Amino acid sequence: MASGGVAPASGFIDKNASSVGVEKLPEEMNDMKIRDDKEMEAATIVDGNGTETGHIIVTTIGGKNGQPKQTISYMAERVVGHGSFGVVFQAKCLETGETVAIKKVLQDKRYKNRELQTMRLLDHPNVVSLKHCFFSTTEKDELYLNLVLEYVPETVSRVIRHYNKMNQRMPMIYVKLYSYQICRALAYIHNSIGVCHRDIKPQNLLVNPHTHQLKICDFGSAKVLVKGEPNISYICSRYYRAPELIFGATEYTTAIDIWSAGCVLGELLLGQPLFPGESGVDQLVEIIKVLGTPTREEIKCMNPNYTEFKFPQIKAHPWHKIFHKRMPPEAVDLVSRLLQYSPNLRSTALEALVHPFYDDVRDPNTRLPNGRFLPPLFNFKVNELKGVPAEMLVKLVPPHARKQCALFGSS
């Protein structure tokens, strides 16, 4: 674990290093449940909160297993996001010039940070990567965990807004690329890691506007779901909440992420949210207006406690009437497979990847609108393809990409 400090609020480090007042964290840190002895050392802290523009944060990494200790300094540049969790700011590494994002969250000293534990497990081209982390404190003696993450400049949310402002539809190739990469990331976190993200929404989908590579971020709500163990149902942001969550289910599955991905795909195609309710009841009404009243069987799949509840009988609205006339039928079909009332009837992320809607991105001749190559889509690692049936594998990895795919070797 990297240790960390924050330079004085003036924003500049005194060239005379000894003039910066540095104090050790209290001894209680050694007994904190957050730490595993092997992975953490007490952080070195300098006062200040570190997020103001020009503020410099100094951390050290290494120093384990004979590695040399290395000092890294970050200059805070601007706040790029905040919420109940804390703040995310853009910073520049002064030693390398690299831009990073630093997510700063208040840390309860009694517990391990679940987001940090999850981030350490993740290694995937469509998931934002953790570079390192360190602790810092404020004058009020509050402990903060700082996650240093790779910086990706755009979000799907802002890309959607951009096309809306221009009164244009998002080019279909971007809809395909973004939704494909969401499904690939979900297949990895669900199957290889066993984690449910629980907050898939356009704001948590980062995009490089030049390459159009997408990365899922914000694992603050993510959790390993254990069958038979209850979970909180008030999870996931409105518009993207699966109906079983609105019904208060506590034994849900990773299929809640699939519903959210279906909502995002619908929004990419429409330019606006599919189910824009302000409250749980409003959202349910919006869902029922499209999918129709759930059957008793579907309600049982979502939350068995509601089977006797009397819902107004509304007929399903055909999906093709929700989208414009020229919408490719494959797009409509995929949305309908992701947005099923019964969680077990929704496509899995892997099944979505082999859907005909993505045949275009598997074509070696497909290019971005500016003529550039598509981002890497088929560089699957062995753990991503573990247990995938042969007939699915053949669809998943097109012949031209098999050289870059671990499972096919050099064949």
UniProtKB/Swiss-Prot annotation:
Residues covered by the Protein kinase domain: 74-358
Catalysed reactions, semicolon-separated: L-seryl-[protein] + ATP = O-phospho-L-seryl-[protein] + ADP + H(+); L-threonyl-[protein] + ATP = O-phospho-L-threonyl-[protein] + ADP + H(+)
Gene Ontology annotations of biological process type: cell differentiation; signal transduction
Pfam families the UniProt entry points to: Pkinase (PF00069)
Record: residues binding ATP: 80-88, 103
Catalytic residues (positions): 199
Stored InterPro entries: GSK-3, Kinase-like_dom_sf, Prot_kinase_dom, Protein_kinase_ATP_BS, Ser/Thr_kinase_AS, STKc_GSK3
First and last residue of the signal peptide: none
CC per GO annotation: cytoplasm; nucleus
Family statement: Belongs to the protein kinase superfamily. CMGC Ser/Thr protein kinase family. GSK-3 subfamily.
Stated name of the protein: Glycogen synthase kinase-3 homolog MsK-3
Lineage: Eukaryota, Viridiplantae, Streptophyta, Embryophyta, Tracheophyta
